Design a protein with these regions (language model features):
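Metal-dependent phosphoester/phosphodiester hydrolase catalytic core
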Residues: 1-169
């Protein structure tokens, strides 16, 4: 396996073909669980798409973070009944940004949702798992676009989970 607190370089292959990258792709493993260690974590949220501000991702990446926690409103969908191409495009637009791609290629990303990731805060965990009709498709969309270590529990899909970096949980 990988050694703790070590940097590794990696390549991406699609159908056996090397995908070229503008920068060297790297990943740094966390310190051994329970081991005290300094680390850098970024916190972000309310990341609506405004083209002139999308350069912010390169500013965030310049801090060489060990992890980034996105605290919701990661994209602004706000129209849950229009699930489909509009929502896919909203994520595609963000994820195709070169500065964002560089950040996520080298920084572990953790995310939770808030109202703009769908709409109406209380609907996410309201009384009904599958109502309104758009609720489960929005949960599925979020999970397709964020590789989190957990998705709630079977009875109530969600975006809560825990993770550790060294001696911090």
């Amino acid at each position: 396996g990988l050694k703790p607190d070590s940097e590794y370089r990696y390549e991406t292959l699609i159908d056996g073909e090397l995908v070229k990258s503008e920068t060297a792709l790297r990943v740094r493993t966390y310190p051994r669980e329970g081991q005290a260690s300094a680390f850098r974590m970024g916190l972000g949220g309310c990341a609506g798409y405004t083209p002139i501000y999308e350069r912010m991702w390169s500013t965030v990446a310049s801090h060489d973070l060990d992890a980034m926690l996105m605290l919701g409103d990661n994209v602004y969908l706000d129209l849950p009944e229009m699930a489909g191409a509009f929502h896919d495009y909203t994520y595609y637009r963000r994820q195709s940004n070169p500065d964002f791609r560089k950040l996520v290629a080298s920084t572990p990303m953790y995310s939770i949702w808030d109202d703009h990731d769908a709409v109406i805060d209380d609907i996410w965990m309201g009384r009904y798992r599958d109502k309104p009709d758009w609720k489960q498709p929005m949960v599925n969309l979020f999970n397709r676009n964020w590789v989190n270590p957990g998705e709630g529990v079977t009875e109530w899909p969600g975006c809560w989970y825990s993770f550790s970096i060294g001696d911090v949980e």
